Amino acid sequence: MARVTDGIAELLGVLPEEIIYTSGASESNNLALKGIVQASRHVGKHIISTALEHSSVGGALSALQQQGCEVDLVDIRRDGTIDLEHLRELLRKDTVLVAICAVDSELGTVQPIQEIADILRDYPNCRLHVDATQAVGKTKLVLSGVDTMSIAPHKFYGLNGSGLLVKKKDLVIEPQIHGGGSTTPYRSGTPALGMAMSIEKALRLALENQNERIAHVAALNRLLRAELAKYPKVRFNSPENAVPHILNLSVNGVKGTAFQQELGKNDVCVSVESACSVEGTPSKAVYAVSRDRKNALSSWRISLSHLTTEAEIAEFLQIFDRCYRELAQ
């Protein structure tokens, strides 16, 4: 286990003792948020986050609000990134946590993590948590100035039910699972060696082949954008500088669920909102960017990977054309 942990730490550029094994990003996010805030009661109870976060972050924040914490959401700009000036305005002496996703799961927007970390240097009692679930293998990971970072291996072809929390060595957080500290005092329970080995292998493949994989996916994304832009009712929600693996779009006047169902009849799988959202509600991320509820309800997401082929894109475009003619005209 020590050798595997050393390998993971080396790949991420952190210390082995900064690696905490979890059951997934949901547990990692809960451990980080609750652990930081509960260990910082003597400083304050003010938290800053965004409307773009995964439901495990939103759920943890709701639980902390019930414990007396105050949560402010930083504004989102039209390009999907957070408003850094508004972040500066929200920061207070009693702010103990800023929780931001590195890459938004619905739009693919890359957040300015380094700039956020630089701003927080003037607030030594405030910790920065980054949910990097959608970032690994898709963009450069920023760890400088980050106190905790959640990683979900199943997003880069690791196993479901496995996760990591990278925690800065000197940071003290409150454990959420108590018992014997076999590998860390912050999360009781003995991690499975096979799970750890699968994380190391998947992480190594994702990072060592990252540039080649990104270039392939970016070419497919450009092809999709060029062809889909020919349809007058198509509106792209993902910004141009989003990770190429995620392309969010709307077809004006057609609910995203209707397109999802019609494409599904042709064995094409697309997503409406994030996987853990409440069914029937508009996409929080798309609404935050477009300020348009109808557009948010019409939005859906195409996911690409290094395994996606040009032939699959060509077949998808043929199927999309038939669905568009049936639903949008």
Located regions from the model:
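Pyridoxal 5′-phosphate
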Residues: 1-329
